[in-house]
Amino acid sequence: MNHKLTLKEKVGYGMGDAAANLVWRGALAYLAVFYTDTFGITAAAAAMLFLVVRLSDGVTDIIMGMIADRTQTKMGKFRPWILGSTPFLGLFMVLCFTTPDLSYSGKLIYAYLTYIGLTLAYTVNNVPYSALMGVMTSDDRERTSLSGFRFAGAFFGGLLVMGCLPMLVDLLGQGNTAVGYQYTMWLFATLLVILMCVTVFTTKERVTLQQVSKPQDTKLDSPKTETGTQVVPAPRSLTSELIDLGKQLPLILVPLSAITAFFYYRDALTGAFFITVIALTTIAIKRLTRRPEAENTRSQQDIIDLLSNKPWLILLGMGFLTMMFNGIKYGVIAYYFKYYMGNELLTGYFFISLLVVSIFGALATSKLAAMFGRKKLFIIALLASSVLTSGIYFVPQKSVSAIFILGCSAEFFAAILPTLFFSMLGDSADYSEYKTGRRATGLVYSAGSFVQKTGGGFAGALVLLVLGSYGYNGLDINTINQTLPGMKSLMSWIPALFGFAGAALICLYPLNDEKQKEVTQALLSRRSEQPPISA
């Protein structure tokens, strides 16, 4: 049955993303400027750091999704991982903003180790957290409502870290920025642990996979054709399946390496390498998907199921583009107000304004989706936010009020995007189960988390690469004036391009609200007739 969630459970779930965003938005907004202006790493080196660390995410997100899907405890599949990873997430949050007295090479090594540690802990925590939404209820409207609470919590956490961090650094550091960052992060790490515990102990996992016959006709318009027998790969140990997954990882890592190299170097050689890799990867994927199901292991079949899931593939592209859109803006704000506007304290006030508006945008998403439909709302929100963001380019340099008005207006619509994205990921998991009789909720959400983090990493790297191309050096004030045009572009039309691209892509999304209801009803019918099995 479709379980209606209580307000307590929705708020409790939202507290988890408030905690996660103390890390996520703190790193997104301030880690780049911390590396370049406090720790003394060059913009180009920091850009490469952000890109390389995202390659490790390509492995850990997918592996974590598979591990979570195969976890069976009294607490469920996902909540034990959230609870166990929380202390490590808080610790690495502090370490990333700590400045040990090292040589330049030592600083780079330290930055790589601590940032990789942070992203690994975030993966182990946030992949299960994201997937938890998919098993708390099977009602798509309840998921949209829950997603609204999630991102209201996210923006509340972001409000704390992004709005208060500059003031806390100044207050606790007493003129020593490095000390101020470290003490501030200890405060946020403590709060993170408390909020994550609230989430774990106020939520419950309810949705389980059912043993069903695989439909012969998997077209969306034929949901009731359920004859035929599902081919279920023989159970194997998690270790065996992870080893098997390792054999499939080149399909992820090699294309990621190619696009990372091309993104950073932007020359003919890396461009040719990227095109070649994509062509070979496409051939390899086609060969894999044509194999008979009986020859596939479970991990292979999970990957095949998702690669044939058009809604999921489109959502992955949307996740990347929307994160580039939001990530570029958030990544340059600290630089923009410190140097372009000439008032660093405005950074915190601007973030507070954005995040207050974001909370209203996230909470309004459920009602707006009911009015327009989620697909149409996604398009409207992207176009409106992109147009308003691009308008910042034409605002005079000292027009603070105009910047705040345009920025907040754009942020209201931008806040709708992640709320819809994670709600619709649950729909794509339903669609996969509908077509194949198999469900891999953790893998679906881990991939969603991966593209979001990849988009954030590429967005941060793009900010640093653009600033570096203008000759920016955070320790040399003489380089600032020449980088102001780059800051202006990064705050306006550059992110808007990714928003317009996202609006075009979502037009291809095949699941409107009516079709999603068909899928939901078909699955509810199956679940009422069949006993549950482990997913």
Over which residues does each language-model region extend?
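Membrane-embedded alpha-helical bundles of multi-pass transporters/translocases
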Residues: 1-535
